[in-house]
Structure formats: structure tokens, C-alpha cells
Design a protein with these regions (language model features):
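Cell wall/extracellular polymer interaction/catalysis modules
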Residues: 1-126, 130-148
Length: 148
């Protein structure tokens, strides 16, 4: 099962659309890189494998086998994790601003079910993260200048 996250970068955060077979599953947000550490990029574009991990009473989805070999274990969360300060991708019902939105537990659960079903059937689940620079300010290669 292949998922695609099409991103648009903004100074206040990243907005995106999560697709499967060109059909929209949900919208997603990511907090800006500066939210975590200066000069550290947000989750790098590339193709990631997805896995389910148990977490207390529920399961979580996380990205692993990251293209550059660092930052493995990035979670897809129900909401932005401000307590643990983790980088994460958050499914939302509505985008309300740059990297902001209304968290959607329903969208997150649907995604969890979809990934879980694929993995149980022995499929490999992947997430390709990409962007279209013409749609928004793309900070992938210019982030250091933006942060100065």
C-alpha cells in the first residue's frame, strides 16, 4: 500500500494532503521546524516505510527506514505533541492556518485501520513525502536563509 503526502511549506508550518491512489484520505499539518530546534529541517522528503507500534491501550503509526538514515521513528499522531516535542504528522479535518488545523481523531483512526489492514495482509506500507514548490514557499533548500 502506497500513500503520498503532498506538502506545501510556509514559515508558520507545513500543510499537506494525504492521498492513496490519487484519492484524498485527509489533510495533514506539521509544526514548523523552528518549533523544535533551530536549523533542523522538518521531516525530509522521501519514501518511508510505515509500521504500527503498540502504545499503552492503542497503536500508533510511525515512519521508519528514513531515506537519510536519521530521524527514524517519526510518529503520525492524533494531535501535535507539545509535551514530548516530537516531530509528527497530524491528520486534520480542516486546515486553519500555516501548520495549524483541527485535529481529526476519525481521520487518524481511519489511517491507522488502513495501514494496519495492509500490514496484516502482508503488504508493505509506504509513505512518499513530496512537495510542489510552485504551490507555496518551499523551504527545503532555503531554510537556513529563512531562519536568519
Amino acid at each position: 500500500m502506497d500513500l503520498v503526502l503532498n506538502r506545501e511549506y510556509y514559515p508558520g508550518g507545513t500543510n499537506g494532503v494525504l492521498l492513496q491512489d490519487a484519492s484524498m484520505l485527509c489533510k495533514c499539518i506539521e509544526p514548523p521546524a523552528a518549533y523544535f530546534k533551530p536549523l533542523i529541517s522538518c521531516i525530509a522528503e522521501g519514501i518511508y516505510e510505515l509500521e504500527l507500534i503498540p502504545d499503552n491501550q492503542t497503536q500508533r503509526i510511525r515512519l521508519f527506514r528514513c531515506p537519510n538514515g536519521i530521524r527514524s521513528g517519526i510518529p503520525i499522531e492524533v494531535e501535535i505533541s507539545t509535551i514530548t516535542m516530537e516531530r509528527n504528522i497530524v491528520p486534520v479535518s480542516e486546515i486553519t492556518g500555516e501548520g495549524r488545523g483541527t485535529p481529526s481523531p476519525k481521520a487518524w483512526q481511519n489511517l491507522l485501520d488502513l495501514v494496519g489492514q495492509a500490514l496484516q495482509q502482508g503488504e508493505k506500507a509506504t509513505l512518499e513525502i513530496r512537495s510542489y514548490p510552485e504551490n507555496a514557499l518551499n523551504l527545503t533548500f532555503h531554510q537556513i536563509e529563512w531562519m536568519d
